[in-house]
A protein has these predicted regions:
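A short, structured beta-strand/loop element
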Residues: 15-43
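Conserved functional loop/turn residues at catalytic and ligand-binding sites
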Residues: 37, 46, 63
Length: 88
């Protein structure tokens, strides 16, 4: 399950080998994603994509926009145009 940790400015996704993370800055209704991390042993298994799908659904539910400074987030949105409307 993906959860927002607003105090730490990140989303957290519990996985077998720890946590996958998506770091952001929030200002004026825009969430700027700066970095994502997936534990090294689990990379390449689609966990980052699963996390971003849930994260972007949450961003939409909050009525926010997105600036993808992290290349992974930018690529995810490009590959999943159903989230393109979230781009600021």
């Amino acid at each position: 399950m993906v959860r927002q940790n607003a105090a730490a400015n990140r989303y957290e996704f519990d996985v077998d080998a720890g946590e996958a993370l998506a770091f952001y800055h929030l200002a004026d209704g825009v969430m700027t994603f700066t970095h994502t991390e997936v534990p090294a042993p689990l990379r390449g298994r689609g966990l980052g994509s699963q996390m971003m799908h849930a994260v972007l659904q949450d961003v939409r539910a909050q009525g926010l926009k997105v600036v993808p400074r992290c290349q992974f987030v930018a690529d995810y949105i490009r590959r999943n145009p159903e989230f393109a409307d979230l781009l600021a």
